[in-house]
Amino acid sequence: MPKRTDLKSVLVIGSGPIVIGQAAEFDYSGTQALRVLKEEGLRVILVNSNPATIMTDPEFADATYIEPITPEVVEKIIAKERPDAVLPTLGGQTALNTAIALDKNGVLEKYNVELIGANIAAIELGEDREKFKGVVERCGAESARSHIIHTMDEALEAAKDLGYPMVVRPSFTMGGLGSGLAYNEDDLRRIVGQGLQYSPTSEVLLEESILGWKEYELEMMRDKNDNVVVVCSIENFDPVGVHTGDSITVAPALTLTDREYQKLRDVSIAVIREVGVDTGGCNIQFAIDPATGRVVVIEMNPRVSRSSALASKATGFAIAKIATKLSLGYTLDEIPNDITQKTPASFEPTLDYVVVKVPRFAFEKFPAADNTLTTTMKSVGEAMAMGRNFTEALQKALRSLEQKGSQLDFSSVPEYEVAELIEKAKRPTTDRLYQVQRALLGGATVEQLFEATKIDPWFLDQLELLNEVSREIRQAGALTTDMLQRAKRHGFSDEQIGALTHNSEAVVRGVRQALGIRPVYKTVDTCAAEFAAYTPYHYSAYDEEDEVALHSKPSILILGSGPNRIGQGIEFDYSCVHASMALRKAGYETVMVNCNPETVSTDYDVSTRLYFEPLTLEDVLEVIAAEERTGGVMGVFVQLGGQTPLKLAQQLADAGVPILGTSPEAIDLAEHRGAFSRVLDKAGLVSPKNGTAVSFEDAKKIADEIGYPVLVRPSYVLGGRGMEIVYDEPNLSRYIANATEITPDHPVLIDRFLEDAVEIDVDALFDGTDMYLGGIMEHIEEAGIHSGDSACVLPPITLGSNVVERVRTATRAIAEGVGVRGLINIQFALASDVLYVLEANPRASRTVPFVSKATGVQMAKAAALIGTGVTINQLRTAYKMLPETGDGSTLPLDAPVAVKEAVLPFSRFRTPEGKVVDSLLGPEMRSTGEVMGIDKHFDTAFAKSQAGANNALPTEGKVFVSVANRDKRSVIMGVKRLSDLGFEIVSTGGTADVLRRNGIAATPVRKVAEGSSAEGEGTIADLVVAGEIDMVFNTPSGGEARSDGYELRAAATSIGIPCITTVAEFNAAVQAIEAMRTYEWSVTSLQEHAAALGESQKAAAAKADLQHA
């Protein structure tokens, strides 16, 4: 059936900020969907609060709303835009829950809007655990024995039937939030309590434990003519009990017998029909008992999910794109496969390779958190690799994680350690794979480890095989052709072979290349080479036949940013994608190298060619060699993907690879303290007093000279890893003792910490002659909080025009002194009217997408062209990529105000005792994503940013205030304002006295440390947990009060109420609350903002010309 003709406009709901469990994969699916809708001639309206996404680029939709994704706001957009339909299946759980709410509230009916891509009945059947159980039974399949409960008493009753351990899963949550394993009644009370709170319907499922069973999922699609395809089967390396997002996963499933696979297929097809998904994709998860072969259906997601992004990248079958076409009325047999251009989408993909996905964790950011893996997802990113066999794909995937110790270690294992390793491996943690492999290497048997871990014996055999190959390498003596070929076919890196043969990586590489042992590149074509592929999408293998086609002109390589992690996320992928788009438009062939399956950059049609490879020196050099042999390389961009490719810049240049844009020497100069301070001296600029130390004696001497507090950090890090503010000598000695690897090459940097300074962030472009200043951001939190976690506002709201002018001059002097060609990000601090330079990064920064969205200028595209020799003047005139006059520092007074707010993952991480980790901000970055609020005025923009970050401010109720002595004076005005607005103020001891003396009625409550009174009056933490407080404002002080504050903040985080920890943010919140009480919110699209901005810039230019004349 051809597509429907009655739909003229569609509203797509995005997934909002990147959080654990809902990450970049939804930008990838959303971008594909928007492209399809536009190609089909529809008017496209988008709402998404995350500015770091490609899908919110104005060219992808006709009206792009960067607004909070709440039913109230989406209703405003529907009222204004009047779409014919809403497509909610591409924005994860956020979009689905919003669509369900709009349907329940009667909004869809009121405006006569249809839901496409999924119907409410199918969502309810798939997501509501009680109803889904019925579906499975009607299909003649089994689900685990279970009870649905809504209260704690019901839970305790159900426990009598099910017995411990049991699995607890709330309904309608994402990434396993609020779920867990209860081994006893205490666990049950704790987990069910959280689950009832996180589930929007206060419904929780308790089910029998199927711990240790094998877990699989099938990715399916169905159209309205009842054609069903199974796109991909995925198997989890870890047994049931570890969330699939935290497990190593393998596609296709490798340990199923043919009969078992057919059974899973039959059940899946019956389930998708019974649920009624008929215009899109879904995934279904199964567990199989290894002892009896009993099959149980775990759950299904009636939408595009994390697994569908993985399945798309693993097979080349564009699930999101095809799901969108199905929602418009097409059927699978009418949709062509992009890669082969001959087969329709009703052909199931066939794989002649193995795909392995490995999660990337960030426990180093939360030292107090427990690294046991459970049914609540904790990983922040993932890497994927492909190989001709499992061992090769696994080793490549581990190498792609880029974490110290992420590659398998084959050094010998003493006998006494084996028993300890087996014992440790019983508990699933981030280290389990390594413990299992080391135990096998030390002589443990496959049986022993299967007993301990329930990991399928086939996988354990594969690890044993890797250990065998490592022994052969060690015993070979010399680097022979046979040995190297065997090692390479099992995925060993030159570095690993070097360690086993006592050679350097460079020597191994030299010998290997001299012997002619080089990888070839195979193609992902969805059909195991049955038809030719038109979209070159490659992976390396040590095989016979190379499939890279000849190209007529030299290519430009863009090195991506690898797996997402805290400090290096989707913002860097955004710059890589923009560079590829701009360079292709300018007529270049672009080649993307990356290993992150979630992102837009690894979509097969973003660049001319895609290599799905680890970003290590060895792998990148081989890709460059493959490009050289087939048509030449013009150069490589290393400054778009964050720290990952930057680290390779010097080694690539040493290997004779041309680096485009800023040179490796300039990159080094900005990182090198001494050289950089000479640039500042020459320009007459100052930085906070600082020094570098390689020992505690050095550090003590420097700290005494510059005075405490000091900021200490290792050199060459991103996201403030290992950074700390140190207030005295004992803490300094503790920091140095814990700092790993302080060497003369990697000293510790010590800076004077500027208290009460305003931090300023600048993104600019420089071409060697001219500068274009993209934007000046003023941080809302004071200095000392990592720039990635601080809220910031553009244009700046409290900086005078003379400060802006000084920032401009300083930015230009630094860009020129460093020798930047392209993007540079500089952080300044303004203290007592002195402008200090904190640091300069000659690369794309994490604020580039935000600045681009706020000012309507796509800076990463401009930077890519500057790297190929285009000047800023040409970008203003010929390319029309930059405004003809002025820049981001000369925005007119009526320009919209944009606020960027960080989104933090504290509710996911718990200490071993089950408490939430502390939500205090500091110099080490902890946020996973960001949102943007944009409006005519700062107060409303700030309110929108808080709502978008799931931290909506209250407009009435009780506010708890307790601040450190140093802050008491500065909060009186704000608290008085809240009191005047009718809020009830609640406070402890000292703060309450100060407030009362200033005429503010404050109700006193007990501190956490005081405990409950004899009369049973609870503490402030008890009030928060009981839901009696609407907002917490608590600034930390030292010692006991610190733990008091922690208990309080943990209570606020676990119940999900706003918890403010800095004075500056509190004052902004008071302004925002007042604005919310006074004005109605309006919604404005980026396209409307850009048009208005253009008008006022023209008017300003005309006025300036008149004055000249």
UniProtKB/Swiss-Prot annotation:
Keyword Repeat included in the entry's annotation: yes
Region (Carbamoyl phosphate synthetic domain): 547-950
UniProt key word Iron: no
Chain residues that bind Mn(2+) 2: E299, N301
Reaction catalysis annotation: hydrogencarbonate + L-glutamine + 2 ATP + H2O = carbamoyl phosphate + L-glutamate + 2 ADP + phosphate + 2 H(+)
Region spans: Allosteric domain: 951-1109
Positions of the ATP-grasp domain: 133-328, 677-868
Residues that, per the record, bind ATP 2: R713, R752, L754, E759, G784, I785, H786, S787, Q827, E839
SUPFAM superfamilies: Carbamoyl phosphate synthetase, large subunit connection domain (SSF48108), Glutathione synthetase ATP-binding domain-like (SSF56059), Methylglyoxal synthase-like (SSF52335), PreATP-grasp domain (SSF52440)
Disulfide linkage: none
Residues at which Mg(2+) 3 binds: Q827, E839
Cofactor note: Binds 4 Mg(2+) or Mn(2+) ions per subunit.
Residue ranges annotated for the MGS-like domain, each copy included: 951-1096
Residues holding Mn(2+) 1: Q285, E299
Subunit: Composed of two chains; the small (or glutamine) chain promotes the hydrolysis of glutamine to ammonia, which is used by the large (or ammonia) chain to synthesize carbamoyl phosphate. Tetramer of heterodimers (alpha,beta)4.
Family label: Belongs to the CarB family.
Protein name, UniProt field: Carbamoyl phosphate synthase large chain
Organism expressing this protein natively: Pseudarthrobacter chlorophenolicus (strain ATCC 700700 / DSM 12829 / CIP 107037 / JCM 12360 / KCTC 9906 / NCIMB 13794 / A6) (Arthrobacter chlorophenolicus)
Native organism taxonomy: Bacteria, Bacillati, Actinomycetota, Actinomycetes, Micrococcales
